[in-house]
Swiss-Prot record:
This is Homoserine kinase. Its EC number is 2.7.1.39. The lineage of its organism: Eukaryota, Fungi, Dikarya, Ascomycota, Saccharomycotina. Pathway: Amino-acid biosynthesis; L-threonine biosynthesis; L-threonine from L-aspartate: step 4/5. Commits homoserine to the threonine biosynthesis pathway by catalyzing its O-phosphorylation. SUPFAM superfamilies: GHMP Kinase, C-terminal domain, Ribosomal protein S5 domain 2-like. Disruption phenotype: Threonine auxotrophy. Leads to accumulation of toxic levels of homoserine. Sensitive to 5-fluorocytosine and sulfometuron methyl (a compound that increases flux through the threonine biosynthetic pathway). Decreases survival in a mouse model of infection.
Length: 357
């Protein structure tokens, strides 16, 4: 049999843009890449599902196909379509420059890559809406997922589903991605979901973006889990705070398209009262950064916010990138936190699949 090879690229993403908590996301030109080779002459029997993994990039990840997020996700898609294992001789090399647990959508990129991988392995020919359904069964916040899958500047929401469909979309994640410990399956076999996801779990819209606006990310050198970051949020909000964000999100989605960009309007419309103030205690220096980094003191700055659940800071700017980055890094340094910075453009193509010749 001939050797098959293909490559899947998925951009990083930044969610919760300004007032757009759980709504707005952008794809960024920092790519998770997986290179898949299927060569029947290679012995892959050492893996329970015949997929050998290799990895280079940020952090450490599991190499067993039933524990790695990318291959777990692919196995879920395949299982829902009657496919148990990868083809014998499957090798998957993961190259991941996206920092783990920093608010740049590393898990969303992995999930999107896994869904695309399952689609290719099974030759399922799923369209983007159906691919999104599979993604949202695992990552139930569409802002990162839609941005990673589609690229660009995206708004999204979850549709209201029937009670039956809602039950399926809210099952414990261990039923979707079975939990394994020391090679042993922990999730009860009869609980593992093999039913295809409901149709149209989420909806998205693609906004325009002024390409003069660049994305400067300042990335602190510590991880912050989304679960921990969400745990500090209130269960109920005050109406004035909700209205505050609604007013700004209505302006921001248009302001980011206008040319020339109105820096002051974008800056004011990127303010938030729904999540950032509650996360100050988890990210030393965040409050100072938001107070000190303004268009008045940094010409070229359009807006600033927490990227996703943090701790990364997202600065939208047209100029003055080096000074902005250096001063944000210095604020964190005073808190004993080292940072890296990356200047990125939007990734407009989203996730892609390319076959070798």
């Amino acid at each position: 049999m001939s050797v098959i090879s293909f490559k899947i690229k998925v951009p990083a993403s930044s969610a919760n843009i300004g007032p757009g908590f759980d709504v707005l996301g952008i794809g960024l030109q920092l790519y998770l890449t997986i290179t898949v080779t299927i060569d029947p002459s290679i012995d892959t029997s050492s893996d329970p599902h015949h997929a050998l993994l290799s990895y280079e990039g940020d952090g450490k990840v599991p190499f067993e196909s039933n524990e790695n997020l990318i291959t777990q996700t692919a196995l879920y898609v395949m299982r829902c379509n009657g496919i148990k294992d990868f083809p014998r001789g499957t090798h998957i090399h993961v190259n991941n420059p996206i920092p783990l647990g920093r608010g740049l959508g590393s898990s969303a990129s992995a999930i999107v890559a896994g869904v695309y991988l399952g689609n290719e392995i099974g030759n399922l020919k799923l369209d983007k809406y159906r691919l999104l359904d599979y993604c949202l069964m695992i990552e139930r916040h569409p802002d990162n997922i839609a941005a990673a899958m589609l690229g660009g500047f995206i708004g999204s929401y979850l549709n209201e589903l029937s009670s039956e469909d809602s039950q399926l979309t809210t099952v414990p994640l261990d039923y979707i991605l079975p939990k394994v410990k020391n090679g042993e399956l922990i999730t009860p076999q009869d609980k593992i979901v093999s039913q295809q996801p409901p149709n149209n779990i989420g909806q998205y819209v693609e906004y325009k973006w002024n390409k003069k606006i660049k994305c400067l990310t300042i990335i602190p050198n510590f991880e912050l889990s989304t679960d921990l970051s969400r745990s500090v949020l209130p269960k109920n909000y005050q109406l004035p705070d909700i209205v505050y964000n609604l007013q700004r999100i209505a302006i921001l989605t248009t302001a980011l398209t206008q040319d020339p960009p109105n820096h002051k309007v974008i800056y004011q419309s990127m303010k938030d009262k729904l999540h950032q103030p509650y996360r100050f205690g988890l990210i030393p220096g965040l409050n100072t950064v938001l107070q000190k980094i303004t268009p008045e003191s940094y010409p070229g700055l359009c807006g600033i916010c927490l990227s996703g659940a943090g701790p990364t800071i997202l600065c939208l700017a047209t100029d003055g990138f080096e000074k902005i980055a250096n001063d944000v890094i210095e604020i964190f340094k005073q808190e004993g936190i080292e940072c890296d910075s990356k200047l990125l453009d939007l990734a407009y193509d989203g996730a892609t699949v390319e076959y070798g010749s």
